[in-house]
């Protein structure tokens, strides 16, 4: 679960939410209150944290914290 913990840290910092709110099933927009700009900034922060590039077409498919976990596990 180390990847989840790292992602959670970035999400808490970028979206200014309580750590308890960030669960694998949490949706960035509906549950965590992100807008489209927040999502773009979050993707950029995740790319930097994990030293990966998330193409726009893939970023558009990422709606939940779990989606990010699976993407990073698959593409790291």
From Swiss-Prot:
User: What are the entry keywords?
Assistant: Cytoplasm, Fatty acid biosynthesis, Fatty acid metabolism, Lipid biosynthesis, Lipid metabolism, Phosphopantetheine, Phosphoprotein
Carrier domain: which residues?
1-76
Name any one Pfam family assigned in the record: PP-binding
For this protein, what is any one GO molecular function term? acyl binding
What about PTM? 4'-phosphopantetheine is transferred from CoA to a specific serine of apo-ACP by AcpS. This modification is essential for activity because fatty acids are bound in thioester linkage to the sulfhydryl of the prosthetic group.
**What GO biological process term is on the record, naming one?**
lipid A biosynthetic process
Q: Where in the cell is it found?
A: Cytoplasm
Q: What is its main location?
A: cytoplasm
Protein name as annotated: Acyl carrier protein
